[in-house]
Every structure is written in C-alpha cells, then in structure tokens.
Amino acid sequence: MSTETKKEKKLRNYKIKKALLISGIALLAVQLVATVVFMVILSKVRIVPKDYVIMIDVLLVLILTVVTITQRWVLPGIITKIISLLLSVVLIVGSVYLNVTYGAFKKATDINYTTTCLNVYVRADSKYEKLEDVKSEEFGIMKSLDRENTDEVVNKIQTEIDTTIKTKEYDDVQSLVKALYDKEINVIILGTSHLGILDSLDEFKDFKTFTKVIASYEMKKDIKNDDKKDDDYLNSDNVVTLYLSGIDVDGPPTENRNSDVNIIMTLNTSTGQILLLNTPRDYYVPTSVSNGEPDKLTHAGCYGIDCSVETLEMLYGINIDYYIKLNFTGFKSIIDSLHGVDVYSEFEFTSQNVKGYHFVQGYNHMDGEAALVFSRERYSFPTGDNQRGKNQMAVVNAVVKKLASSELLKNYTEVLDSISSSMVTDMSMDEIARLVDIQLKKNISWDIIQFAVTGSNGNLPCYSLKSPNYVMIPDDAVVEQAKTYLKKIHDNERVVIE
C-alpha cells in the first residue's frame, strides 16, 4: 500500500481548494445575478413598502459580501456556498412570483377606460346580412340615451358604405326595440349595455334570438380620475372606501353593463374593521344622470362605472375612493383557482334557477359554478333580492378569507391571472403599496361586518324603463341606519350590527 508524499498531499489540497474556489466564484456569480434581478423587480413592483425594500436590499448585499469573503477558507467557504445556493434558488423563485404579481396588478390598474359595444340589429328572419343590404333603410336610434356613441357609430357606418343614412329617433329603449318587433323599422342601433334592461321585460326576453347582428362597434371612453371630494360627504384619512361592482355577463370587465352586485367596502385602518354594505340591484333611487328621476340602481352601470359610484355617493352621503369592477361570471375562475371556498348560508334551499344545486344551512364548500348559482338565487327566499345581496356578500367574504390564507400560495400564479383577467380598478400601484405598508406595520386582524339595506316590492316606471317594472322601494329607516354605521366607521368607533 503506497503512502502519499507531502508533495502529492500538497497538490491534492491545492486542487481541492482550486475546485472550491472555482465553484465558489460560479455560485457567487449566480447569487449576484439573482440578487440584482430580485432587487430590480422588488423595486419595480412597488407594492412592498420602501422601508422593507431597503432592509431586504441591505441584507442581500451583506450576505453577498460575507459569502465573498469566506471563500478564502475551506470550511466557512463550504457552509456559505450552501447558503449561496439555497438563497439563489429562493431569489429566483421569488423573482418569478414578484414578476407575476407585478403583471397582475399592472394589468388590473393600467386600464383607465370603459368600453361600450353598439350593434346594428335586424330581425333574425330578415334577408339582411351586411350594412350594404340596409343602406336604403331608416335606422332606428335613441333620441338622448347614449347619443354621443350612437352619433359616432352613424358616422362610421356612413363612411363604410359611402352613403348618408336616414335615422329615426325614439325616446327610450323599449320604444326603439318595439318598433323593430312591430316592423315599423327594419334596423336599429343599440348598445349592448342596454340588453340587461331588455331582459327584465317579458315582451323582449327573446331579443337575442329574435334579432341578429350585422355590424358591431366598440367605443372607448376615458374614465375621469380626479381627487375631488365632496366636502358634504363623509371622508377620513384613515378610512378607505371601495365600491365593488359585479357585472354578471360574459365579456371584458371594462364593458358598461348592468351592475348586479353593488357592495361598498369601507376599511378603517385604525379600528381594524371592514364594513361590507350591500345595496340591492333593483333599489329605486335617482342616479347621477337621471335628473332626479328614480331608476334601478343596476341600470346606473349601463351609463358607466362613474355613474354607479356617484349614485351610491348620493344615496349614502359618502365619498367613494376607488372602485373594483368585476366580471362576476369570471369570478368562477378565481374561486376554482382557489380550489373552492367555504360560504355560509343562512338558509337551506334548492336553487330554482339551476337544477342540481342544493345548499344547507351553515357552511357549504363551493366551486366557482356553485358560488355563482348561490349568488344569483333570489326566488328561493321570502325576501328575494334582499337575501341575494346577503349571499353575494357571503361569497365575497369567503373569497377574501381564502385569499388572506396560506392556501393562496398553493396556486398563486393561476389565482392572480384569474383576478387580473376578470377585474379592473382605478386604484394606483402606489395606493395598493400604501395599504400593504399599513397592513405590514400594524399587522391588522380585520373584523369584517356586513349590513344590507332593504325595502319593499313595487312596480313602477324607471328612468331607463318607461313602463312599470319590478323595483325595490328603499326603506328610509334602514338607509339611515346604514348611514349611521358608515359615520361610526369614519369616526373611529367600533360598529356592532343590531
């Protein structure tokens, strides 16, 4: 058995040290790149408070320095190589997650416009298939509602077919559509935002099958983002008020449609309370565009998200800081990406809208489809739309709790993609960062309370519907109670729902 000479031992040690040094330099290079990329993305995301960003940056630079210095020694160098490798993996994974987060927030916050789709309709049994076929026909249009967009569409049509078209004005949606049904005219221009209004009228429930579209136009309108507050309305520095609007249709959340979900979320960062205030979709109130004439609250969404915001501000005497507009049909994908949510039901019932869905009193684990059925149901309850509003808040509450739990991490990227694809908001990245900063510094354990205004059933004409239609006449006492709760939130008082 040969013995190792001093020269051979020295050579072997030299080779080991050289190998360790080379591997150390390689790991340092990876760690350096991973650190720089992570720091850049962390700074870009802006949802992490600056104090925390600085602390993280200093810590990462310190670790990098220690790893660099210790490479001259064998044992400390081996230990820091392991640390470097693990840290590099964490930084790479963290960079991916941060970038996904940034992309999702940017997608939801960068949209500063609403869209309105106007279609050219003819009867489904007619011979007309394209604009050229109807250029000699008289086009039915609405006299005042959505007139700016309508006039722009008329100009586009005239340019396309190189002909000046004749138009006939109608006072409202009903008379316009009725003229098409009665063959008084053969072609009309109508915005899809008004289709929800037609759905509430028995005589026009078949509109989608009775008609066909021969041309379609999408109009964009910039949203006014100003910081003007009404001094007569409630407004506090430590209170943030969000309006959650849910449009229950397929299509992009930017589209103006009936707002079927109307929840005001008021957060007090001092008391740690969140008040969820639901207003039924059929609440009979003046809107900001109706000149004092009452309309269904849901119809405000047809005229834009700003109309819904202003209408609720008028009703409750508050300033709404931001809106979150959600495609409630797309809400299914959010819940499915969370692998379902546990929703509390006040009643046991079987859905009368969709067969095969039964809910027990108490907690029900729901996938996206079940949650949507649960949120839409009203015919199973004596209080109808009142209970539907409560159920919608229960679903929102369940989703918020799931998002705040560790379950979010199990399917993080899919959840964020679902959220960003189905919602838009006028909250800036800076405001989101401010709220995150408050949460991190105070570690608030939020107390979520719910209240829903109610009313009595009625059958009255609306601003958007001239013939009598189902509405909910507000209970003034309940509305005043809601105002009292809102004032307490703004006055830093704890709210207890009576």
Protein language model annotation of sequence segments:
Residues 1-11:
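Short, Lys/Arg-rich, polar N-terminal cytosolic tail immediately upstream
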Residues 11-25, 51-54, 74-81:
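Membrane-water interface of alpha-helical transmembrane segments
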Residues 20-69:
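Membrane-embedded alpha-helical segments of integral membrane proteins
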Residues 77-99:
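Internal/C-terminal transmembrane anchor helices
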Residues 82-90, 129-132, 266-267:
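A short, flexible N-terminal coil/short beta segment enriched in small residues
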Residues 94-111:
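Hydrophobic alpha-helical transmembrane segments in integral membrane proteins
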